[in-house]
């Protein structure tokens, strides 16, 4: 039997605790049979009922151990889950994990700590978390399982780029260390940018953590914006840090095979760290099958000068010029995704469609 402990936060002051038990053998053998403890908590009873017709063990998945369970089309309430001692087994893969309750303009994506992978299945993105040496969370190990087909990519393990304090700041529901990733994504809008295997996972494990961890622990991003330009197949991340300023990360996918990567920062110390690791990062990416056309590290002014005459990148330079204004318009939300209208290259807030 597997024991699962949890905390459920219904508001800032009320916390409900409980536990339930699942029998792994029955989960594998019969998808409609569940073993739940006699002390059935309402929260998990409802969750189990919603899962009842959809839970499934997938035998053809690459099994890490006997407790490797595949949960398909699960639905559950959008309450936070406490990280400490969450479950006794380590490996889950979730597919189509959506949340019923929505908060403001976001759909809360219910994420369990200690999940070691995330998996893309048609119209959603799943983030897997597990403990690592340097931070409480690390995204993904078996990167090949991220992709539903060759046309998909998982650039959003950019979260690996963040230190533990950053994750706490951005993704805590009520600042009491209840974790829930705050977005779900539509594949048709997001995953049009080719196939990239380990880019951001490498950013953390091979790139960021090779630097001084005490330095990066200050890297607390209060806001993160993601802009998608469908016409040019470009993705732009803007990360804003109270201590270290803003970091602008720009990707252009070329023929679904190679990438151009620009790292733009206003702080010289960040620029120097990036520059000192460019060759190493490029070699690691190449070993993973990602052909990097170029990796450029520059200041804000250098980047603007470089793209000033490039029509395809005018929008990206406009974002960089106005990111402070954009960030101020996101109110209290930490993460939002934007898509530029396909026919509009003028920077106009009315033509930016927020779809998360």
From Swiss-Prot:
Upper lineage: Bacteria, Pseudomonadati, Pseudomonadota, Gammaproteobacteria, Enterobacterales
One family name in Pfam for this protein: Flg_hook
InterPro entries for the chain: Flagellar_hook_control-like_C (IPR021136), FliK-like_C_sf (IPR038610)
Record-stated family: Belongs to the FliK family.
Keyword tags: Bacterial flagellum biogenesis
Organism: Buchnera aphidicola subsp. Baizongia pistaciae (strain Bp)
Keyword check for DNA damage: no
Descriptive protein name: Flagellar hook-length control protein
Superkingdom of the organism of origin: Bacteria
Domain writeup: Two-domain protein with the central portion of the sequence acting as a hinge or connector between the two.
Physiological role: Controls the length of the flagellar hook.
GO biological process: bacterial-type flagellum organization
